[in-house]
Amino acid sequence: MSRIGKRPVTVPSGIEVSLDGTTLVAKKGNLEKRLETHGRVGINIDGSEVTFTRVGDEKQDAAFWGTYRALFNNIMVGLDKGYSKSLEINGVGYRAAVEGKTLKLQLGFSHDVNFEIPEGLDIKVDKNIITVSGTDKQAVGQAAAEIRAYRPPEPYKGKGVKYTDEVIIRKAGKAAGK
């Protein structure tokens, strides 16, 4: 029995939810998010609550039940409040700037790294802090991970791009010789 799947998802005010075949559609203003369930779960929309039910008794059906409920809850939170991730740049000469739809990073390479900002995401830069925000949890996390991957933090001086809440375990340098 999925403990996540059996909990109902509350729909915040201002968001309309409808069912289009096996696709759940959530609208807030001109934003629209769709979740295709492929008929793997039963869906019941009751006012401001959406409940999911298992279709079969297979082990895989229970997994899909909890997964689709969690994905739909992420859509509700994204449309209501949005998601954001913060990254911190550490290092001499390391900089970031937004130019149009491109994030320009100077990370100690012989060239600048240009990161194309994906559709639906917003990136802000304040000194050495990069904030990635948007309504799609997966897209926000993916973009933040791609930016971090250009220059992950190294354990000796901590130079690189890291999440603001990430703890870098530091290593001691080489011991001095005789």
UniProtKB/Swiss-Prot annotation:
Keywords of the record: Ribonucleoprotein, Ribosomal protein, RNA-binding, rRNA-binding
Record Pfam families: Ribosomal_L6
RNA-binding keyword on record: yes
InterPro entries referenced in this protein's UniProt entry, alphabetically: Ribosomal_uL6-like, Ribosomal_uL6-like_a/b-dom_sf, Ribosomal_uL6_a/b-dom, Ribosomal_uL6_bac-type, Ribosomal_uL6_CS
MF GO annotations: rRNA binding; structural constituent of ribosome
Any Gene Ontology biological process: cytoplasmic translation
Stored PROSITE patterns: RIBOSOMAL_L6_1
GO CC terms in record: cytosolic large ribosomal subunit
Function as written in the Swiss-Prot or TrEMBL entry: This protein binds to the 23S rRNA, and is important in its secondary structure. It is located near the subunit interface in the base of the L7/L12 stalk, and near the tRNA binding site of the peptidyltransferase center.
Family of the protein in this entry: Belongs to the universal ribosomal protein uL6 family.
Subunit structure as annotated in this protein's UniProt entry: Part of the 50S ribosomal subunit.
Protein's name according to its UniProt entry: Large ribosomal subunit protein uL6
